[in-house]
Amino acid sequence: MATLFIADLHLQTEEPAITAGFLRFLQGEARQADALYILGDLFEAWIGDDDPNPLHQQIASAIKAVVDAGVPCYFIHGNRDFLVGQRFARQSGMILLAEEERLDLYGREVLIMHGDTLCTDDQGYLAFRAKVHTPWIQRLFLALPLFIRHRIAARMRADSKAANSSKSMEIMDVNPQAVVDAMERHHVQWLIHGHTHRPAVHELQANGQPAWRVVLGAWHSEGSMVKVTPDDVELIHFPF
């Protein structure tokens, strides 16, 4: 019995090794799980479910095979792929979740999320996030021709990279009080998230008791997952 969590694969055609590693993961470890949760940034960018990128179809088919094998797959949007919609969800068999979800895993209450909303010190990013999550702005963007959406997405990624290069690492990390607030709001002692690309298990205090925050690593030179069993919560790195 095990439930698996992954995040921040940033899949793109320019990184075939990561894609190959993910496909092997889906054909192996994922098939043995009780469930698979993808906590955002599965893709480096997402400009709409109507994008005919062959990579997207390849990944949808691979995830659907896992679902068809009896392993439910769930998805929380990240800051890179927040426009993943119901069309792709149907193609892949994934179930789209809210940005914060509380799970009961073998008697252990766990809060899961992508993690970007915990970075409350980065006010510039939060303002941008609020803007691009505005429903009418999303509808307007998705109504644009694909080639224009590609250009806008490329410019946004370039601007984000430039902005992040001038920010301190502390600003781009989670705010400790935001973490405690989220855990106390959901009455949990465990939190699993991604986004920061700083894999670790942090011990803290929440709800007047010891609590733990488990941060998933990004898939760069190796894979990263959290494996929850009835007996343990493990942060695991593995080769592609």
Curated annotation (Swiss-Prot):
<comment type="function">
    <text>Hydrolyzes the pyrophosphate bond of UDP-2,3-diacylglucosamine to yield 2,3-diacylglucosamine 1-phosphate (lipid X) and UMP by catalyzing the attack of water at the alpha-P atom. Involved in the biosynthesis of lipid A, a phosphorylated glycolipid that anchors the lipopolysaccharide to the outer membrane of the cell.</text>
</comment>
<feature type="binding site">
    <location>
        <position position="79"/>
    </location>
    <ligand>
        <name>Mn(2+) 2</name>
    </ligand>
</feature>
<feature type="binding site">
    <location>
        <position position="10"/>
    </location>
    <ligand>
        <name>Mn(2+) 1</name>
    </ligand>
</feature>
<dbReference type="InterPro" id="IPR043461">
    <property type="entry name" value="LpxH-like"/>
</dbReference>
<dbReference type="GO" id="GO:0019897">
    <property type="term" value="C:extrinsic component of plasma membrane"/>
</dbReference>
<feature type="binding site">
    <location>
        <position position="195"/>
    </location>
    <ligand>
        <name>substrate</name>
    </ligand>
</feature>
<feature type="binding site">
    <location>
        <position position="164"/>
    </location>
    <ligand>
        <name>substrate</name>
    </ligand>
</feature>
<feature type="binding site">
    <location>
        <begin position="79"/>
        <end position="80"/>
    </location>
    <ligand>
        <name>substrate</name>
    </ligand>
</feature>
<keyword id="KW-0997">Cell inner membrane</keyword>
<feature type="binding site">
    <location>
        <position position="167"/>
    </location>
    <ligand>
        <name>substrate</name>
    </ligand>
</feature>
<dbReference type="Pfam" id="PF00149">
    <property type="entry name" value="Metallophos"/>
</dbReference>
<dbReference type="GO" id="GO:0009245">
    <property type="term" value="P:lipid A biosynthetic process"/>
</dbReference>
<dbReference type="GO" id="GO:0005737">
    <property type="term" value="C:cytoplasm"/>
</dbReference>
<dbReference type="GO" id="GO:0008758">
    <property type="term" value="F:UDP-2,3-diacylglucosamine hydrolase activity"/>
</dbReference>
<feature type="binding site">
    <location>
        <position position="122"/>
    </location>
    <ligand>
        <name>substrate</name>
    </ligand>
</feature>
<keyword id="KW-0378">Hydrolase</keyword>
<dbReference type="InterPro" id="IPR029052">
    <property type="entry name" value="Metallo-depent_PP-like"/>
</dbReference>
<comment type="similarity">
    <text>Belongs to the LpxH family.</text>
</comment>
<keyword id="KW-0444">Lipid biosynthesis</keyword>
<feature type="binding site">
    <location>
        <position position="41"/>
    </location>
    <ligand>
        <name>Mn(2+) 2</name>
    </ligand>
</feature>
<keyword id="KW-0472">Membrane</keyword>
<feature type="binding site">
    <location>
        <position position="197"/>
    </location>
    <ligand>
        <name>Mn(2+) 1</name>
    </ligand>
</feature>
<dbReference type="InterPro" id="IPR004843">
    <property type="entry name" value="Calcineurin-like_PHP_ApaH"/>
</dbReference>
<feature type="binding site">
    <location>
        <position position="195"/>
    </location>
    <ligand>
        <name>Mn(2+) 2</name>
    </ligand>
</feature>
<comment type="pathway">
    <text>Glycolipid biosynthesis; lipid IV(A) biosynthesis; lipid IV(A) from (3R)-3-hydroxytetradecanoyl-[acyl-carrier-protein] and UDP-N-acetyl-alpha-D-glucosamine: step 4/6.</text>
</comment>
<dbReference type="InterPro" id="IPR010138">
    <property type="entry name" value="UDP-diacylglucosamine_Hdrlase"/>
</dbReference>
<feature type="binding site">
    <location>
        <position position="114"/>
    </location>
    <ligand>
        <name>Mn(2+) 2</name>
    </ligand>
</feature>
<feature type="binding site">
    <location>
        <position position="8"/>
    </location>
    <ligand>
        <name>Mn(2+) 1</name>
    </ligand>
</feature>
<feature type="binding site">
    <location>
        <position position="160"/>
    </location>
    <ligand>
        <name>substrate</name>
    </ligand>
</feature>
<keyword id="KW-0443">Lipid metabolism</keyword>
<feature type="binding site">
    <location>
        <position position="41"/>
    </location>
    <ligand>
        <name>Mn(2+) 1</name>
    </ligand>
</feature>
<keyword id="KW-0464">Manganese</keyword>
<protein>
    <recommendedName>
        <fullName>UDP-2,3-diacylglucosamine hydrolase</fullName>
        <ecNumber>3.6.1.54</ecNumber>
    </recommendedName>
</protein>
<keyword id="KW-0441">Lipid A biosynthesis</keyword>
<keyword id="KW-1003">Cell membrane</keyword>
<keyword id="KW-0479">Metal-binding</keyword>
<dbReference type="GO" id="GO:0030145">
    <property type="term" value="F:manganese ion binding"/>
</dbReference>
